[in-house]
Regions:
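Short, well-ordered beta-to-alpha junction loops that form the rim of enzyme active sites
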Residues: 55-57, 80, 115-119
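Short active-site segment of divalent metal-dependent hydrolases/proteases
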Residues: 13, 120-121
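Active-site-proximal alpha-helix that buttresses catalytic centers in soluble enzyme cores
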Residues: 2-77, 84, 88-94
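Short, solvent-exposed aromatic-acidic interface loops
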Residues: 164-171
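Active-site catalytic microenvironments for nucleophilic, acid-base chemistry
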Residues: 43, 70, 103, 127-131
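Glycine-rich phosphate-binding loop signature in dinucleotide/nucleotide-binding domains
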Residues: 46-48, 104-110
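Domain-level recognition of soluble alpha/beta enzyme cores
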Residues: 131-163
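Generic beta-sheet signal
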Residues: 5, 110-118
Length: 171
């Protein structure tokens, strides 16, 4: 039974206008982004995360690589966690994320991290809270619900109760 879910936004990517941001593979992590990922790994040390589900984009897979290496975690790449595609309705992102959350809940793991992007993280928070979460105090660059390598912790307290907290922001 899933007890803890960590929603991790990718680290800061390289800013290169010639690389489309919202289509696969997108930009790679910058050196700063790699440092953010290392800080996130440090934060997660001792939190007993058992598995990473990861968007296949360059910036998310490189963030996950740092986490997996430092924490010794297995990784599952899934398009369900990928970036909000150009022209993709947000409801479609929510459907994808709903399927991803179902897979996480059906997995044998109790503590899972998902390395994704701002829009799917917003969709996950809305899904898991039945749209009751107030994200108005959590608006970061690009309108995202977390800064780069920010981590939301969702605790599953019982079948109906969940606690949400933005627990980590890199320095």
């Amino acid at each position: 039974v899933l007890s803890d879910l960590f929603l991790i936004r990718h680290g800061q990517p390289v800013h290169d206008p010639s690389i489309p941001y919202h289509t696969h593979p997108g930009p790679a992590l910058s050196e700063h982004g790699r440092g953010e990922a290392a800080q996130a790994a440090e934060f997660l040390t001792g939190r007993e995360v058992e598995h990473l589900f990861v968007s296949p984009f360059a910036r998310t897979s490189q963030t996950a690589e740092v986490l997996a290496e430092r924490l010794g975690l297995p990784v599952t790449f899934t398009a369900l966690a990928q970036e909000h595609a150009p022209g993709e309705p947000f409801e479609q992102v929510r459907r994808r994320v709903r399927e991803l959350l179902g897979a996480a809940e059906d997995s044998p793991y109790r503590r899972i991290a998902i390395v994704s992007h701002g829009s799917p993280i917003r969709a996950a928070l809305l899904e898991l809270s039945n749209e009751k979460i107030d994200l108005s105090r959590h608006v970061y660059s690009g309108g995202n619900p977390a800064p780069t390598c920010g981590i939301w912790h969702v605790q599953f307290l019982d079948a109906y109760t969940r606690r949400f907290e933005l627990v980590f922001k890199p320095s």
